[in-house]
């Protein structure tokens, strides 16, 4: 539905140290062009019933950021796409609501720019999700510690306001953390279109939130069955 190929991988590869990911996207673009695949840019499908004349349909509509509208001021948060791909301007102190791999990588990218990130994470550790590459998790945790990134574990945000957030710690007490911007790092949720069927298949994040490896494997599996 946009004017370019890549989906959320464009955002994930936008950081300064993701040269290999950028090269992979360019390789895929060249392969698509080489195979003469018909691409309809700026075209969104909201109803699979409009897709006529196809033997098989593969839905790869990805995911959207998880939201928590019950938190006052949540609408003030910035998405990863706005921060990394669209390069929206941020201040010196950038707070990440969530301490997963995406948040830690983006925080490291900001450190390289001379910014001062802050992380608020509900779990007891950073990059706590399972099935994450140990080399990545170890480096990111070490990098956050080395650069003395203020990190609040076992904590959540109860309100977002101009100039900072209200954080609730494990002991139930609240305190204020000053920041210039808040990044929504609480994850993504699948955004499929239509229902699965005998000739309708889903791949990528619209099935379940994964990583580059899982989405490629899922696409391969579906294509081999077709």
Language-model-detected regions and their locations in the chain:
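A structural signal for short, hydrophobic beta-strand segments that form beta-sheets
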Residues: 45, 156-157
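Rossmann-like dinucleotide/flavin-binding elements
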Residues: 1-5, 40-53, 60-71, 76, ...
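Extended, charged coiled-coil helical stalks used as long, distance-spanning scaffolds
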Residues: 26-29, 48, 161
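Generic beta-strand structural signal
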Residues: 159-160, 202
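Short polybasic amphipathic segments
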Residues: 163-168
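Residues that recognize and position ribonucleotide moieties
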Residues: 150, 158, 175-177
């Amino acid at each position: 539905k946009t004017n370019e190929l890549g989906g959320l991988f464009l955002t994930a590869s936008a950081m300064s140290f993701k040269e290999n990911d950028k090269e992979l996207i360019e390789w895929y673009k060249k392969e698509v062009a080489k195979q003469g695949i018909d691409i309809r840019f700026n075209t969104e499908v909201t109803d699979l019933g409009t897709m006529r004349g196809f033997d098989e349909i593969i839905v790869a509509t990805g995911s959207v950021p998880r939201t928590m509208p019950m938190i006052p001021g949540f609408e003030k948060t910035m998405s990863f796409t706005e921060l990394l791909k669209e390069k929206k301007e941020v201040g010196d102190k950038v707070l990440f609501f969530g301490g997963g791999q995406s948040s830690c990588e983006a925080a490291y990218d900001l450190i390289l720019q001379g910014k001062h990130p802050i992380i608020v994470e509900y779990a007891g550790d950073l990059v706590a999700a399972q099935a994450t590459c140990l080399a990545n998790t170890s480096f990111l945790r070490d990098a956050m510690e080395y650069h003395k990134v203020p990190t609040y574990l076992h904590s959540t945000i109860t309100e977002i306001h101009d100039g900072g957030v209200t954080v609730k710690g494990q002991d139930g007490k609240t305190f204020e953390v000053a920041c210039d911007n808040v990044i929504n790092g609480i994850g993504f949720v699948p955004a499929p279109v239509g229902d699965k069927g005998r000739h309708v298949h889903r791949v990528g994040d619209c099935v379940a939130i994964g990583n580059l490896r899982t989405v490629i494997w899922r696409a391969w599996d579906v294509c081999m069955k077709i």
